[in-house]
């Protein structure tokens, strides 16, 4: 039986290096992802995947989103690099991957619309956004062109939760027990 796991995270090492250079204040997030072997070392990840015949993934890039550490002038380039890198991984390993979920520079609406079209042309299966844009509601009217582009190019939107270690999933917890934000 074939199973497809949608929205499983990975961190392309080249993308992480570029982002850490751009945003040293967020380096801890990239280092954390790089220290999870199956998230950043594709040989290690593929070894795990080999153990599950018929299982494939449609991966996306793990947090943090580019809009949290790059302004609207730099985030488009970083989102494009991330999408290029994840596409390379998927194309190099078709036995494990059915496609990828693309990231967009949500803090630059015009560039997001352009990246959505490019993602469609690249074969992306969907677009990843986060539950808020640096504290702002994602249903704000200025973001509607992003949703219209996803509709136009028939790309589903997958919404990634945003929080952090100190933001619990449940009211009676003091911190995130399951790290759903990561």
Report residues per predicted region:
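Helix-coil boundary/capping segments in enzymes
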Residues: 1-182
